[in-house]
């Protein structure tokens, strides 16, 4: 009560913050008349002037007003668009490193240019993050006109670029790209062996478009670069063959927690099946030898009971492709881990791909927290404001709309069954289609979108085939004639290639579009259709300029006329009076785009995104959700009392209940799910932070090693530390000489250092101490390495040391990641022993890291003490080639298998190879003669070190 009164008199915290920007908005507006008078060259010259002021000590905040005014003027001259005052406020929020929540159609893409330009003046590179390659290309080309006009360079990172192209794009002042590409480039950079091969610069400032989708919806999905392990496809197929022999009493499914477990009867049945197939070791399924078998059975059960085709994944080109649960988009290249993807492949009877070993991984949560400054834009973030601040320290600022929202959001209609619900949706579509009001129907999955499509087909509607040219001609013709077309379009992961086109034309009179959650985020639905989309498509084959101009005028006339038709597509509804009240009255419901939701999502934010497709920039619109008690949210999380309440009300088939109380009950169910998902993500982050801290140490160490011309001091320190540990283990401090394990020490020195030292004789000397013994061993080891340097030369030795150190570090880090994954899978069991799993994980992970560090010292020392380069007769020592690997993030395949790493650029022709200079050898086949001139095959000479 008191809080509400305070807000009434003083405004909310959000209102006060927005008002605080007004003085700077006024200052920017005051500069406009002055900038209008400048020539293009004078306006462009302001960029160099701003950079000079920064160099002289001014801050970016000092330059905000003149820089924003400059961008606004440049946008007017290049795009014909002028930033509104509210867009200037959005730009300030982004510059301050927070999230600007702006409604659909308010020009988020244009808003970003303000903060991007200002921060790009620092010369450290600004990253703009989009959700797909199409938007990255579109926005970089579109907004790049502004930056280019002002003398700044723009790059774009999309799938399929090589390292040279990526490096060029990252070197630009502004770089557009997808979250996946940025993350994978970071991981790949930290698998390189030379600094000059790395493509990214240090992480300075990023603006994330659709920030809620990337930082919340995808937060649980780690980016993983992996390599294949042994092929066990037959085993997966064998296990999958058992599943049809189980019935529902053999396992328990918990949809809420998304878990499935075998019952006692199920265990006995599986044991019998495994024994008959010769796959059971020992007597019981739960004997230690069968741990992996149990794991595979559990994954097969999950694949069959918790994952649904066309909802969680689709089968395309004989491959199982994951569907993003929030966007509805396909995620080619992404694979479920821990054998689940292989279980799905066996279930669908497609080729089972080998399991993968993680080579490097990071979550978006930890990747984006590396930036000095992070900001974001979205139309819907307020419901997740707490999470965004808690994890990323980003505040959500709601930016006022330029024009007030004129959309009517109606109460939900709730039916008993899905069949009744779909019948009601069909009836609503038919009424809207009769008055030519465009309809966008949102569904939760491909499966549901195709069920609805079949409903429409069975009632005389035809699906538009976007594979044909001029696919929308019949829709346009019907709209011109003022008649319903009875045509509909489907937008889901199967048709994602035509996504932008389908969405852009969803505002044409009489258009019916069925969309999964993806709903074409990033593409506006303009009433009457999109001029920008139609003109290039419909004039592509016209060469005659006069004819092209006539066609463009016809399209413009179409779009304007169509817009008028849609605006007038209002519905007049007669409200039945209550008994004894006044006569019936009529209510006019607005035209514009009509959003129909076919079910509620777990997250209110996803529902708000769907509603937000309508009512852009002050346009009228409507939205309504049609629900049934058989929907997933209602069935899994809804209250059982709701069903009994509807039964008591005596609802007849086809009748709906409509009441604000229902909306509130649903919102509470959604809040419960959101809170649960937040807890899951927060807990995931706590565990991932442990690995992330270790990842930072390893990756920073790699960069430092690559920066150093020589790592001789590092490997010497490692050698001494290893010898210290070895001597301390066998010759305890303050122990008598008789208690020393001299034989064990001598054996270890021979095994690791390849040195046969008279340790037993030294131990017999009168008065010798452990410290003296340590010094003698270290001196002998140092002399051994000094002899190698003298033999091969310091340059060759420095190269060998660095290569062995980096390759060994990478190998052990990969093994360490596997250990951490295994630890994470079982650490939850510690909770049964009244121990905190997180604290236990931290302790165990630290111990594993310490062990890895000790193993690194031993492995590097052992390899360097043993490594030999056999020189050709009467020739100087030469450098052994080393193998490098670059693993593709999508396939996990090694793209550079057996590629030779050399000190210089490879020669293009074998004739240019200098036997004395390995840098000139280039790529060598393992069965070729060795270029050194020894007469041996490369694999038996220098190639054996690869």
Swiss-Prot record:
GO terms for biological process: intracellular protein transmembrane transport; protein import; protein targeting; protein transport by the Sec complex. Its cofactor is Zn(2+). Its EC number is 7.4.2.8. May bind 1 zinc ion per subunit. It is found in: Cell inner membrane; Cytoplasm. It is an enzyme of class 7 (translocase). It is a peripheral membrane protein. The keyword Protein transport applies. Residues 905-926 are annotated as: Disordered. Zn(2+) binds at residues 930, 932, 941-942. One of its GO terms (molecular function) is metal ion binding. The keyword Translocase applies. It catalyses: ATP + H2O + cellular proteinSide 1 = ADP + phosphate + cellular proteinSide 2. ATP binds at residues 87, 105-109, 524. Its main location: membrane. InterPro entries: Helicase_ATP-bd, P-loop_NTPase, SEC_C_motif, SecA, SecA_CS, SecA_DEAD, SecA_motor_DEAD, SecA_preprotein_X-link_dom. Part of the Sec protein translocase complex. Interacts with the SecYEG preprotein conducting channel. Has a central role in coupling the hydrolysis of ATP to the transfer of proteins into and across the cell membrane, serving both as a receptor for the preprotein-SecB complex and as an ATP-driven molecular motor driving the stepwise translocation of polypeptide chains across the membrane. Belongs to the SecA family. This is Protein translocase subunit SecA. It comes from Bradyrhizobium diazoefficiens (strain JCM 10833 / BCRC 13528 / IAM 13628 / NBRC 14792 / USDA 110). The gene is secA.
